[in-house]
Swiss-Prot record:
Tissues of expression: Hemolymph. Produced in fat body.
Post-translational modification, as annotated: O-glycosylation is important for the antibacterial activity of lebocin.
Name under which the protein is recorded: Lebocin-3
Protein family according to the UniProt entry: Belongs to the lebocin family.
Organism this protein belongs to: Bombyx mori
Encoding gene (name): LEB3
One GO biological process term: defense response to bacterium
Primary subcellular site in the record, as a coarse category: secreted
Parts forming coiled coils: none
Keywords noted in UniProt: Antibiotic, Antimicrobial, Glycoprotein, Immunity, Innate immunity, Secreted, Signal
Length: 179
């Protein structure tokens, strides 16, 4: 019976590893949520609170200054019987001219390239985005450990000493060239 229990436990471990099952342990707890900050309303009275007091910059009238004026002032004076789609000054940008144009650019190829308005969205071709990368041992690379102790030098003299030792051992002495 003891051999059967040992064999079955080893078999369960191999099966869990082979079937790519990872047992998720609840080790992460999200931080506690903070209560919303409540602020009191400033007592403004009947006066609007401007950011800069005392400057002589003319400001647009507001409804607080003039309660008779409407909340939305129409400075452009557009004709209410005419529909303006994109721009008042450029009649080529209205919706009627956009519907009748083809939106293709011919650059001399076999087929013209469509502009960005008629192009297809690539999210429909690849709805999931990138394929998932396997993370189990036959697929993921083993980590390479690099000694980071000598990466940053504290003093420039250490670099000069190392360069001097390198020149002594691996380079040709300058005395040979002077002869």
């Amino acid at each position: 019976m003891y051999k059967f229990l040992v064999f079955s436990s080893v078999l369960v471990l191999f099966f869990a590893q082979a079937s790519c099952q990872r047992f998720i342990q609840p080790t992460f707890r999200p931080p506690p949520t903070q209560r919303p900050i409540t602020r009191t309303v400033r007592q403004a009275g009947q006066e609007p609170l401007w950011l800069y007091q005392g400057d002589n910059v003319p400001r647009a009238p507001s409804t607080a200054d003039h309660p008779i004026l409407p909340s939305k002032i129409d400075d452009v004076q557009l004709d209410p019987n005419r529909r303006y789609v994109r721009s008042v000054t450029n009649p080529e940008n209205n919706e009627a001219s956009i519907e009748h144009s083809h939106h293709t650019v011919d650059i001399g190829l076999d087929q013209p390239i469509e502009s960005h308005r008629n192009t297809r969205d690539l999210r429909f071709l690849y709805p999931r985005g990138k394929l998932p990368v396997p993370t189990l041992p036959p697929f993921n690379p083993k980590p390479i450990y690099i000694d980071m102790g000598n990466r940053y030098r504290r003093h420039a003299s250490e670099d000069q000493e190392e360069l001097r030792q390198y020149n002594e051992h691996f380079l040709i002495p300058r005395d040979i060239f002077q002869e």
